[in-house]
Amino acid sequence: MGRDAIGVGVLGYGWISRAHVHALHSLNHIAPLPKRIRLVSIGGRRAEPLEAAARELGFERWTTSWEELVDDPDVHVVANCLALEGHAAPSIAALGRGKPVLCEKPLGGDAAEARAMWEAAEESGVTNACGFNYRYVPAVTLAKQVVGEGRLGDLRH
């Protein structure tokens, strides 16, 4: 792959993955970027729907092995849109290979997994970001305010 493109690998082929891919497609058209976005590989568990998603979404290839996607030299960044149990291991592996990761929320199943992801990013010097796409939605902002003011009483979680 030439230096004119950023190769993206996406883990998962559900609705949130499709939202990420739509945003990635848009990046090539909304502004003059120094590099274009190239959809290299999409990964998941089941071959038949994965192959259909790859074709529909415009990926060059697909794989049922997250290891293969993370190890692919044409994949420069990884968007991890798998279910929660698929967040930590692939993200840590990608970060360990120096590939930035955008992982859907929550980062891990517990604080230890999230910390391991953070440590992998720190050690490799690349970004591990979490998709907090609802953070500034008015309803969420209002809920935070109501909880913060104690208007709902003493909450437990």
How would you name each of these model-derived features?
Residues 60-66:
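Conserved SAM-binding strand-loop segment of SAM-dependent methyltransferases
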Residues 77, 84, 88-135, 150:
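Beta-strand-loop-alpha-helix segment that lines the small-molecule cofactor/substrate pocket
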Residues 40, 60, 74-76, 156:
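Conserved acidic residues
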Residues 4-6, 126, 155-156:
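Nucleotide donor/acceptor-binding cores
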Residues 1-57:
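N-terminal Rossmann-like dinucleotide-binding module
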Residues 16, 134-157:
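Predominantly a Rossmann-like dinucleotide-binding segment in NAD(P)-dependent oxidoreductases
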Residues 8-10, 80, 103:
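Hydrophobic Val/Ile/Leu positions in short beta-strands of Rossmann-like dinucleotide-binding domains
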